[in-house]
């Protein structure tokens, strides 16, 4: 274990690996928090554009790890192993004081294991717990052996780890603290230059190429059904890059060209822009792929329908392993069904259109929004620890 005097004689070196946009956001917030607390540190590993803009030294593109699904991962396994081995070699020659794996558990837990197997003097932290409480609970043994500290976003996760004698800290979800409890829909619409009097529905097919390929046709199909019935409603689709924007626009021209004027594709204006969040915030109803974005929509207090369609083989395998009743974070946090979840065959244009239409009823939407508000308050009222202090306590 490192002593305080060891740390005071050199600049702290922190290795971080993130695999997607949400991890990039957590990573840049962590970097800023270290600096705001006057801790002299340098950061390296795999980071996203926000982290790189903050001075992060990224050895590989973040997109290298943006692979979802068991079948998809198997296709890229050699590349992922090469990246892992490259990082281990780098940190064997130039050790960091602590490695913080942010989300991306399948990659980061293996990387932490490799660092421990090489007996490198590196403390290991997993920021964002893998869903061990949901499926593959046997992984908690591996986490106990290879991870020195788990930083949990939700209180029920810390309780789970403590039951298994794993060191954990509940640090709260940064978004719960960042997003205000009082949130104006009218102001959000005006911020995007939208008409506050109009009804907008957000369609979020995801940020990865494969997700958009799989989910956009269903979203556009549901919009077609609803536009025939509600021609004045307009649709907002966020795109995180020019490449994704072109993919979505090509999809619209292929699937629903007659409604192109009602389907607006919006993209990030700058590095700090969060177009997905802005679009959800400016929408009366949100339809989105189950994942971190469902938590964001909940914290914005927007009525939503969640869905997911996996590769068929991936879904069959996952179904055998998953031990929880719900898939979306709002339902998992609440421990009950708060939002509708459409999985696999239920995720089709007709069913999605039907669920969106139900939320057009103001009373139904209002009930869901009140539940979101209540859960938001719960996530910021708990006793949370500062992630930087939790990490510093570990390495001192």
From Swiss-Prot:
Record-annotated disulphide pairs: none
- Provide the catalytic activity annotation: a lipid X + a UDP-2-N,3-O-bis[(3R)-3-hydroxyacyl]-alpha-D-glucosamine = a lipid A disaccharide + UDP + H(+)
One Pfam family this sequence matches: LpxB
Q: Which GO terms describe its biological process?
A: lipid A biosynthetic process
Q: So what EC number does this one have?
A: 2.4.1.182
* Entry's Gene Ontology cellular component terms: membrane
SUPFAM superfamilies from the entry? UDP-Glycosyltransferase/glycogen phosphorylase (SSF53756)
In the record, what terms sit under GO molecular function? lipid-A-disaccharide synthase activity; phospholipid binding
- Keyword annotations from UniProtKB, A to Z: Glycosyltransferase, Lipid A biosynthesis, Lipid biosynthesis, Lipid metabolism, Transferase
Pathway, per Swiss-Prot/TrEMBL? Bacterial outer membrane biogenesis; LPS lipid A biosynthesis
Q: What class of enzyme is it?
A: transferase
**Function field:** Condensation of UDP-2,3-diacylglucosamine and 2,3-diacylglucosamine-1-phosphate to form lipid A disaccharide, a precursor of lipid A, a phosphorylated glycolipid that anchors the lipopolysaccharide to the outer membrane of the cell.
* NCBIfam families on file: lpxB
What's this protein's family per the entry? Answer: Belongs to the LpxB family.
Q: What is this protein identified as? A: Lipid-A-disaccharide synthase
Say which species the protein is native to: Acinetobacter baylyi (strain ATCC 33305 / BD413 / ADP1)
């Amino acid at each position: 274990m490192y002593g305080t005097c060891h740390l005071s004689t050199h600049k702290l070196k922190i290795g971080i690996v993130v695999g997607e946009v949400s991890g990039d956001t957590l990573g840049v917030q962590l970097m800023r928090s270290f600096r705001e607390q006057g801790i002299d540190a340098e950061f390296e590993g795999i980071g996203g554009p926000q982290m790189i803009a903050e001075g992060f030294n990224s050895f590989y593109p973040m997109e290298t790890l943006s692979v979802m699904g068991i079948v998809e991962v198997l296709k890229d396994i050699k590349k992922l192993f090469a990246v892992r081995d490259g990082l281990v070699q780098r940190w064997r020659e130039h050790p960091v004081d602590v490695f913080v794996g942010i989300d991306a558990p399948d990659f980061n837990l293996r990387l932490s294991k490799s660092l421990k197997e090489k007996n490198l003097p590196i403390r290991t932290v997993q920021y964002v717990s893998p869903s061990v409480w949901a499926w593959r609970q046997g992984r908690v043994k591996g986490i106990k052996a290879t991870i020195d500290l788990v930083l949990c976003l939700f209180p029920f996760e810390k309780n789970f780890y403590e039951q298994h004698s794993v060191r954990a800290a509940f640090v709260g979800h940064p978004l719960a603290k960042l997003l205000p409890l009082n949130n104006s829909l009218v102001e959000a619409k005006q911020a995007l230059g939208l008409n506050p009097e109009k009804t907008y529905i957000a369609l979020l097919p995801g940020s990865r190429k494969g997700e958009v390929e799989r989910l956009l046709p269903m979203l556009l199909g549901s919009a077609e059904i609803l536009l025939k019935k509600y021609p004045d409603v307009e649709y907002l689709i966020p795109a995180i890059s020019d490449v994704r924007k072109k993919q979505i626009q090509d999809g619209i021209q292929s699937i629903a060209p007659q409604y192109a004027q009602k389907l607006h594709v919006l993209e990030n204006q700058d590095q700090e822009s969060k177009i997905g969040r802005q679009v959800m915030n400016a929408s009366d109803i949100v339809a989105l792929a189950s994942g971190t974005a469902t938590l964001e929509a909940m914290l914005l207090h927007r009525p939503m329908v969640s869905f997911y369609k996996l590769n068929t083989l991936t879904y069959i395998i996952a179904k055998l392993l998953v031990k929880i009743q719900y898939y979306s974070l709002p339902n998992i946090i609440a421990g009950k069904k708060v939002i509708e979840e459409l999985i696999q065959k239920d995720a089709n244009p007709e069913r999605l259109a039907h669920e969106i239409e139900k939320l057009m009823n103001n009373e139904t939407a209002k009930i869901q929004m009140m539940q979101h508000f209540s859960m938001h308050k719960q996530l910021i009222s708990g006793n949370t620890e500062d992630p930087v202090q939790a990490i510093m306590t570990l390495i001192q």
